[in-house]
Amino acid sequence: MDLRLYDTLTRRKRAFTPIDPSNVRMYVCGPTVYDFAHIGNARPVIVFDVLFRLLRHLYGDDHVTYARNITDVDDKINDRAARDFPDLPLNEAIRKVTEKTAAQFQADVAALGCLPPTHQPRATEFVLPRTDGKTDMVTFIKQLIARGHAYEAGGEVLFDVRSMPDYGALSGRRLDEQKAGARVAVDAHKRNPADFVLWKLSSENEPGWDSPWGRGRPGWHIECSAMSTAYLGDVFDIHGGGLDLIFPHHENEIAQSRCAHGTHAMANYWMHNGFLQVEGEKMSKSLGNFVTINELLTTEKFGGRKWPGEVLRLNMLRTHYRQPIDWTIKALEESETILRRVCGRIKQFEYARRGMPTKERSVQLNLPPEILEALVDDLNTPLMLSRIGELSYDDAFDHALLSIGIDVLSYARWLRSQEQYASSNVDELVVARLEARMRKDFKESDRIRDELAAMGVVLKDGKDADGKPVTTWEIAR
């Protein structure tokens, strides 16, 4: 079956023809690591993980290269570091913020069932020329200047948008329609209001690198152009991200890459997922409906309970990736009901009910034609999920859900463990351990802790609002 994908640039669904079938290449914009990822950030991660899995199924695991960057240099990071660690030197504070946030991001997306990309380059590793010869940002900018597409002014290096005749093709914005101050920075040094920063100077207190234009740091857009070139080449197959990145980020990536390399394209297919709102409203901290992936997984902030990663992932995929999605408690409950029903229909669930341990599975997926037909039609996961109930043999349920990253057997085992622990004396043991700790009987406390650990119970000690010791628990996944 032929894969067809909706291409934002041509505004139509196109048959996918890779440049090199032995090395299909995809780049997706990753997180800026200044804060924990929210549920809206999870959507492109899940969507393009499904595409990564599908490409591997169609072309082979060893014939797909997927790069997703980590932006660890940004003014938001600087501000967060100064706020959270005011007593530390800024560079040290930045390192603490980015390392903690990046580690949490990796844990979150793993809990959502996402495969690690082939490459996850960090922006700070690609600012200056590298010993391995991979493309870096300073060299990229010098190339743009040499080709007449960038200029130095007011201590900055700026991209000259007039040097690219079809600038704005991705977003459909003509240069004469773009007003200064409307999503383009006002700068008296610019030749055109839409010109954007490639390099800016850093103050003594700001992070920076020595360059031909003075000590400074890269602009946002140049990072992705350099890192995608480093791992995927001048022109590659697919570039993905959220709708909010079409302008200015992806538009400017295209301009930089095409002008630096003298190519007809940066990527042959541009894919974008739709927006996410929460309970019918735009997600924002001021409305109190802002929720991170970690909060959904580990706290009772949303709906008064924790949500398994499989439920979050299924809920995301019940809506087509290009359509807007309303993230609601009701929808999550419906997704959980669907998963429970599927578990009940798989004969292997009987093994899970007997408590067999979860094992890493390497499964050669045998996808029924009707399932694959839906997936190759622009990742039509809603259609694919609607067809699961029509399948007539048990393995098909398992393989169909595995193809979109949901390990239903693992989820089934977890369900069974939850049922077992609900009827056990875990709560009593947790209370007994806490009491032993409070009376400083650490030998007894450690004994109970080890007993619970052997049962797969993970303990978390803390304090309540009044400062009193409390212990919560959960089942290890």
From Swiss-Prot:
Annotated disulfide bonds: none
Residue ranges of the motif 'HIGH' region: 31-41
Gene Ontology molecular function, alphabetical: ATP binding; cysteine-tRNA ligase activity; zinc ion binding
GO cellular component, one term: cytosol
Keywords of the record: Aminoacyl-tRNA synthetase, ATP-binding, Cytoplasm, Ligase, Metal-binding, Nucleotide-binding, Protein biosynthesis, Zinc
Catalysed reactions, as listed in the record: tRNA(Cys) + L-cysteine + ATP = L-cysteinyl-tRNA(Cys) + AMP + diphosphate
Pfam families reported for this sequence: CysS_C (PF23493), tRNA-synt_1e (PF01406)
EC number(s) from the headed UniProt entry: 6.1.1.16
Cofactor(s) needed by this chain: Zn(2+)
Entry-linked InterPro entries: Cys-tRNA-ligase (IPR015803), Cys-tRNA/MSH_ligase (IPR024909), CysS_C (IPR056411), Rossmann-like_a/b/a_fold (IPR014729), tRNA-synt_1_cat_dom (IPR032678), tRNAsynth_Ia_anticodon-bd (IPR009080)
Binding site for Zn(2+): 29, 224, 249, 253
GO BP of this protein: cysteinyl-tRNA aminoacylation
Residues annotated for ATP binding in this entry: 285
Keyword Protein biosynthesis listed: yes
Subcellular localization, as worded in the UniProt entry: Cytoplasm
Family: Belongs to the class-I aminoacyl-tRNA synthetase family.
Name used for this protein in its record: Cysteine--tRNA ligase
Gene giving rise to this polypeptide: cysS
